[in-house]
Amino acid sequence: MAPRRNAGPGPGGRPAFADAPPSVLPADSEKTARVRAMFDTIAPRYDLVNRLMTLGLDQRWRRATVDALALPAGARILDLACGTGDLSRAAAKRGHTVVGTDLSAGMLAANQARVPLVESDAGHLSFADGAFDGLVCGYALRNFTDLAATLAEAARVLRPGGRLAALEVDAPTSGVWRLGFDVWFNKV
């Protein structure tokens, strides 16, 4: 299946999709439905909240994640759970050919990266075996319904010797940072 093409800004400055394929999403599990609904809701404010929560350091961390792949320019990269496209943009700026995929149509609509986009569950990808040289994933591992199935799919779409780099949060150990983390991840 051909990925959705980001056809540039549409109404309201959001990307328009051309040649959009039918959804390749499997039947919803309860967690999948909750995760999709949450990200559809927060998509317009996601980048702002991320910048505030990380004091802007998330951009540096995303660049470091792409650099950790250690792949030459021109490599085909899959941005799994691409969201608004920060990792996709970081990879494209380093000369990679990027495709983004996300479960949330709202996040894809807010995606500002000018790369092909596909709405897909990470555990059921529509790409050929060995289609990518590298795969990046940012802040998403905890949201996958079946992490083992997702990692198996990642391995399937990576070429032999392909590389995966994931950016994820960890609980801080010091005072106010720990309190903020607990409030955000356990109450919000």
List each language-model region with its residue ranges:
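Conserved alpha-helix/loop element of class I SAM-dependent methyltransferases that forms part
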Residues: 45, 54-73
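N-terminal, positively charged/glycine-rich alpha-helical extensions of SAM-dependent methyltransferases
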Residues: 2-45
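Conserved class I S-adenosyl-L-methionine
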Residues: 163-187
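Short glycine-dipeptide loop
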Residues: 73, 158-163
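A short acidic, Gly/Pro-enriched loop at the edge of an enzyme's catalytic core
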Residues: 123-134
